[in-house]
């Protein structure tokens, strides 16, 4: 698994509420959270699909030719 995906969820220290996705290593799933807009870490994806591609290996390889 990509080491980025093992980082804890970090909402950041600003007060915005951007819906983002992170990989939860306890549940082994990508889950939604609200990102504050600054700070945080790399376990922070714009879409569920992006999170699953990086952390679960889903994506291009799973698409039909």
UniProtKB/Swiss-Prot annotation:
Cellular component GO terms held in the UniProt record: extracellular space; nematocyst
The extra comment attached to this record reads: Negative results: does not inhibit voltage-gated potassium channels Kv1.2/KCNA2, Kv1.3/KCNA3, Kv1.4/KCNA4, Kv1.5/KCNA5, Kv1.6/KCNA6, Kv2.1/KCNB1, Kv3.1/KCNC1, Kv4.2/KCND2, Kv4.3/KCND3, hERG, Shaker, HCN1, HCN2 and voltage-gated sodium channels Nav1.2/SCN2A, Nav1.3/SCN3A, Nav1.4/SCN4A, Nav1.5/SCN5A, Nav1.6/SCN8A, Nav1.7/SCN9A, Nav1.8/SCN10A and the insect channel DmNav1.
Q: What does this protein do?
A: Dual-function toxin that inhibits both serine proteases (trypsin Kd=124 nM) and voltage-gated potassium channels rKv1.1/KCNA1 (IC(50)=0.9 nM). The activity on the Kv1.1/KCNA1 is selective and reversible. The toxin presumably acts by blocking the channel pore in the open state.
Q: Which UniProt keywords apply?
A: Disulfide bond, Ion channel impairing toxin, Nematocyst, Potassium channel impairing toxin, Protease inhibitor, Secreted, Serine protease inhibitor, Toxin, Voltage-gated potassium channel impairing toxin
PANTHER family in the cross-refs: KUNITZ-TYPE PROTEASE INHIBITOR-RELATED, SERINE PEPTIDASE INHIBITOR, KUNITZ TYPE, 3
Q: Where in the cell is it found?
A: Secreted; Nematocyst
The species is Anthopleura elegantissima (Green aggregating anemone)
Q: Any idea what this protein is called?
A: KappaPI-actitoxin-Ael3a
Q: What are the BPTI/Kunitz inhibitor domain coordinates in residue numbering? A: 5-55
Q: So what family is this one in?
A: Belongs to the venom Kunitz-type family. Sea anemone type 2 potassium channel toxin subfamily.
Bilayer-crossing residues are none
User: Which Gene3D superfamilies does the UniProt entry name for this protein?
Assistant: Pancreatic trypsin inhibitor Kunitz domain
What intrachain disulfides are recorded? 5-55, 14-38, 30-51
Hey, where's the site called Reactive bond on this chain? 15-16
């Amino acid at each position: 698994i990509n080491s980025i995906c093992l980082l804890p969820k970090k909402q950041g220290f600003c007060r915005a509420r951007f819906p983002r996705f992170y990989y939860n290593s306890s549940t082994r799933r990508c889950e939604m959270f609200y990102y504050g807009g600054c700070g945080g870490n790399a376990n922070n994806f714009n879409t569920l699909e992006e999170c699953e591609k990086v952390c679960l290996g889903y994506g291009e390889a799973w698409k039909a030719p």
